[in-house]
Regions:
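N-lobe entry segment of adenylate-forming
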Residues: 1-34, 38-53, 57
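Conserved AMP-binding/adenylate-forming
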Residues: 32, 47-95
Length: 103
């Protein structure tokens, strides 16, 4: 089996990298370094948390914040729980945010 044949779904990326190169750096953000193993583990925790909060498949999960490596853990967590991430630009005006949330 080739490396790429193991990646079928977006959520497989964290798992495959976590298995193949667990100690390699996945992200460096400010003073925080996250390995692929940690990235996979953290995204699993996010997915489990979403399920525990009764976020159903295809439910939308809105995220609005400034840049952070944690965003990618949320993206993977949503993929693993089959929910949909909705990134909202933090610079939008309140009516624009309301429009996105109500759409």
């Amino acid at each position: 089996m080739t490396y790429f044949s193991e990646i079928v779904h977006l959520s497989d990326i964290a798992r495959v990298h976590g298995d193949r190169c667990p100690d390699k750096k996945a992200f460096v953000f400010e003073d925080r370094v996250v390995t692929y193993k940690e990235f996979n583990t953290n995204s699993e925790k996010v997915a489990n948390g979403l399920v525990l909060e009764n976020v159903a498949e295809q439910d939308r999960v809105a995220y609005m914040d400034k840049n952070s490596d944690r965003f990618y853990e949320l993206v993977m967590g949503c993929a693993k729980s089959n929910s949909v991430i909705v990134g909202i630009n933090w610079r939008l005006a309140p009516p624009e945010v309301a429009y996105i949330l109500n759409d």
